[in-house]
């Protein structure tokens, strides 16, 4: 499966032994070339995460973070605090082609009150979790404006239990929001 291959490549990416910027550039290019076929859709192939075999609706919830935080999350087996009372997740899928990353950051910042979402790189990566019995749906909604001016509504969820089991982490990767 592409997700397993991508996860494997992501965990193999080690730069601690790299001693020069040329080596780092070469290492990153090789890693990028290895994972490119795993993350880019083929001709007439959708990138919608729900069509890649993920469950729909309340089944998958997404955490948006930067890459270093995501890696700490994986290795530590816990969610980061990105909300006043724990971890904020949402049902906004990471391959939403009609929403820009800036708009996603605005919505996350508004929903969480977390100043870190002012920088788009703070939400360039996602982790998808399946643990609906451990989250609370918040009363507010996250309203985003699409690239066509349409109002899109997503639900924020909170988890105060920050530890997670390995099987609850379904996928992770780089977000593919609209550029703009």
UniProtKB/Swiss-Prot annotation:
One function term, GO molecular function aspect: beta-glucosidase activity
InterPro entries for the chain: Glyco_hydro_41
Superkingdom of origin organism: Eukaryota
Keywords for the protein's UniProt record, in alphabetical order: Cytokinin biosynthesis, Glycosidase, Hydrolase
Top-level class of the enzyme under EC nomenclature: hydrolase
Entry EC no(s): 3.2.1.-
GO annotation (BP), single: carbohydrate metabolic process
Protein's UniProt keywords contain Hydrolase: yes
Function: Hydrolyzes cytokinin glucosides thus liberating free cytokinins.
Protein name: Cytokinin-beta-glucosidase 3
Highest classification ranks of the organism: Eukaryota, Viridiplantae, Streptophyta, Embryophyta, Tracheophyta
């Amino acid at each position: 499966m592409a997700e397993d291959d991508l996860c494997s490549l992501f965990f193999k990416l080690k730069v601690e032994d790299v001693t020069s910027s040329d080596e780092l550039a070469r290492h990153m290019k090789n890693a990028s070339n290895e994972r490119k076929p795993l993350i880019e859709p083929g001709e007439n192939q959708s990138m919608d995460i729900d069509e890649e075999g993920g469950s729909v609706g309340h089944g998958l919830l997404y955490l948006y973070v930067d890459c270093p935080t995501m890696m700490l999350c994986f290795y530590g087996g816990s969610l980061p605090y990105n909300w006043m009372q724990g971890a904020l997740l949402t049902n906004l899928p990471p391959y939403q082609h009609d929403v820009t990353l800036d708009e996603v950051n605005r919505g996350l910042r508004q929903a969480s009150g977390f100043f870190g979402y002012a920088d788009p790189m703070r939400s360039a990566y996602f982790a998808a979790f399946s643990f609906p019995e451990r989250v609370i749906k918040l009363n507010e909604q996250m309203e985003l404006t699409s690239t066509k001016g349409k109002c899109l509504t997503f639900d924020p969820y909170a988890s105060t239990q920050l530890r997670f089991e390995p099987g609850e982490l379904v996928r992770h990767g780089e977000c593919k929001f609209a550029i703009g």
